[in-house]
Amino acid sequence: MTQFNIPVTMSSSLSIILVILVSLRTALSELCNPQDKQALLQIKKDLGNPTTLSSWLPTTDCCNRTWLGVLCDTDTQTYRVNNLDLSGHNLPKPYPIPSSLANLPYLNFLYIGGINNLVGPIPPAIAKLTQLHYLYITHTNVSGAIPDFLSQIKTLVTLDFSYNALSGTLPPSISSLPNLGGITFDGNRISGAIPDSYGSFSKLFTAMTISRNRLTGKIPPTFANLNLAFVDLSRNMLEGDASVLFGSDKNTKKIHLAKNSLAFDLGKVGLSKNLNGLDLRNNRIYGTLPQGLTQLKFLQSLNVSFNNLCGEIPQGGNLKRFDVSSYANNKCLCGSPLPSCT
């Protein structure tokens, strides 16, 4: 039997050609945009190469759903990275939010959360994400003020900066965002007054949560223009009239204003028929309880304790589900479940 001996040099050449062909085939079949992959790898580096991002490998396709937290646009088949979830990573030391995020121009959704070692301000590079709809930066140690440049991202629908170390005052400019539907800034160190401009959010704006901060001053009268489904301004240092948040013509479902210094006549406010949660405890609210409370078919929670309310508690409807704790420590409230009026 005749044997053919392939020279060593030819064998090496064939191996090199085979490697090139395999690499070329991989490159041609990869869906991930090269610029997006480069940006993601830089983000990984900027975060100290955490072990939780070990699936982000330069030799694999970032659009094949093996890269943790990365999704690409398969609907339009552009396969640009449009969804990035950077949550729960254990960084080796403190790092700022990577400015390299700006190199993912097709991002629609960005979630950064649960990273204790994430520090520093929200970088101006975020303003370059002009297609961003949903921005979440939560449960980190990111600090500084909420930046004005967010008003440049006209596509924003949701802003959630809850439970960080943010300080400074609320930026008036975000009220100009035409598509913004809600803000969640609770659990920070934000101080100062609520801007008057926050009463001029678009009709799409239905949710405001700025609880557990250091807000002072009064709720702007311009809030009468808003139709909020959910508002939570509890645990601040707000004072004065909050009746502008109420109205029988509104679609309000929850109003949480507990632990402020608000003072207004509760008996004179109109109530949304959709109201299912009302928490007004620990304020200086006076007057009587509205009789309209008995007509609220969806009311599930009520707390008006520790105020200056007087008069007989209305009876009927869903009010029968609430016990003494909902009404305790008022000036002169009476009637079931409190002692009877005399």
From Swiss-Prot:
Disulfide bonds: C32-C62, C63-C72, C310-C332, C334-C341
Bilayer disposition of the protein: Peripheral membrane protein
Gene3D superfamilies attached to this UniProt entry: Ribonuclease Inhibitor
Keywords: Cell wall, Disulfide bond, Glycoprotein, Leucine-rich repeat, Membrane, Plant defense, Repeat, Secreted, Signal
SUPFAM superfamilies: L domain-like (SSF52058)
Entry's localization field: Secreted, Cell wall; Membrane
Annotated LRR repeat ranges: 82-107, 108-132, 133-156, 157-180, 181-205, 206-228, 229-252, 253-275, 276-299, 300-319
Signal peptide segment: 1-29
GO cellular component terms attached to this protein's record: extracellular region; membrane
InterPro entries: Leu-rich_rpt, LRR_dom_sf, LRR_N_plant-typ, PGIP
One GO term of the biological process aspect: defense response
Residues listed as glycosylation sites in the UniProt record: N64, N141, N303
Chief location: secreted
Remaining remarks: Mutation of Lys-253 confers the ability to inhibit the F.moniliforme PG.
Family membership noted in the UniProt record: Belongs to the polygalacturonase-inhibiting protein family.
Function: Inhibitor of fungal polygalacturonase. It is an important factor for plant resistance to phytopathogenic fungi. Substrate preference is polygalacturonase (PG) from A.niger >> PG of F.oxysporum, A.solani or B.cinerea. Not active on PG from F.moniliforme.
Protein's name according to its UniProt entry: Polygalacturonase inhibitor 1
Organism, scientific name: Phaseolus vulgaris (Kidney bean)
Gene: PGIP1
